[in-house]
């Protein structure tokens, strides 16, 4: 039987937490239930492949594998380099950078505000830069922003020249140049390149526009941090999660959350369980489904994008958060699996990394239940 159409076909059911398996406890120690991988899954081989610095995946810092709600394998290696202190070895308590996986966390925050009745997906958003009468950007909806079909001109290019600069890249200028103090304003100031809704354009600027909308609702700076802690990271026990805000008080949701690998796995488990955590429905299950339904094909690499998440058409319902240098949280409902991989993989090796993730998912999906 061929896989269901990822755009229109039925979504596979999301598994519940198995009876007798406790939810991960709160606190910096992680306090995850642990278990063994199923018979026939050679996890040591798969982890060796990921952690071979001379192999196609390059530098892997952390891998955490959660099966049926239990950590069944994890591995840490390498050192984090910093300009102001000696390199530090990576371990279970090391906060690592999400890069664009933060976009998927923004999806959760928007879902909370939609459920609260404070945001409407289908009404034009209130963005100050678009408030002038007749501005065609004023018709852009939150739904179009989440799908990255807003039509705004934004160049997402991380290549640097010999002077470590890229003067044609909007994302470099936003994160590290003229836009760094107010990322939402920088991105919202971009002109239209296409009518809203017409085509897909992957854009970190789009995510930061959405984050600016959230900041105006919940309050910038510390109130925003508290909202993230009280409504998302705190309830799932992700004590290490640290979102970074810019000088304007906007969470740079395109790129910046530091957390341990196990705490990133908590976020994946929240989505695998349909927004439910330890007896509480934190996010509506219907909102989780908006992360699982493909809406666009990324013309740069053929991947399927939903709403700030990525969808794999493998017949297993797999969807994922992905970030620069190969960060990923892979969620597979059919295998009841969360796979976290963090590291520093150059973009020309992304196909090999996606292939490795697919091998891990397939190994668990094919294992006897």
Identify the role of each PLM range.
Residues 238-245, 288-338:
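Active-site Gly/Thr loop motif
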Residues 1-88, 114-119, 151, 177, ...:
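N-terminal leader/targeting segments and the immediately adjacent pre-domain N-terminus
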Residues 69, 92-122, 145, 210-214, ...:
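Active-site SXXK
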Residues 205-214, 255-276, 327-343:
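Active-site-proximal alpha-helical segments within enzyme catalytic domains
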Residues 45, 49, 72-75, 85, ...:
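Short, charged, amphipathic alpha-helices and their helix-cap/turn boundaries
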Residues 2-6, 318, 323-369:
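Structured C-terminal helix/loop/strand segments within mature extracytoplasmic catalytic/sensor domains
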Residues 80-100, 349-357:
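A short, polar/charged loop-to-alpha-helix boundary motif
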